[in-house]
Amino acid sequence: MNEKLRELNVEFLFSAVLQLHTMEECYDFFEDLCTVPELRAMSQRIHVAKMLSEKRVYSDIVSQTGASTATISRVKRSLDYGCDGYKIVFERMDAEAAEKAEAASGETDGKE
């Protein structure tokens, strides 16, 4: 973790985010906290990170996200040399999606 980030205001923000339980709560909180361009920039970066982690090529990422190659390069640097924050989130999201898919297939398997 970058020690430059460790300060009370940042920890307060992270504690606040950890209090959110639903997608609707996230929408409400982040709409209050951020401007629309800030939210779009963050969502674009995480989408770029996901595509890079799936080994997608820059041209596909540019066309699907509208991100500049400079943004893609910065995100790639974070994936390669960062604190593995993206990796942790993507692993958890993938595990949750797999659990939901398994539960859904179990529901359909039992139906006649």
Region roles according to the model:
Residues 1-20:
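General nucleic-acid-binding
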Residues 14, 69-96:
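C-terminal structural segments of small proteins and small subunits
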Residues 60-65, 72:
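Short alpha-helical "recognition helix" segments of helix-turn-helix
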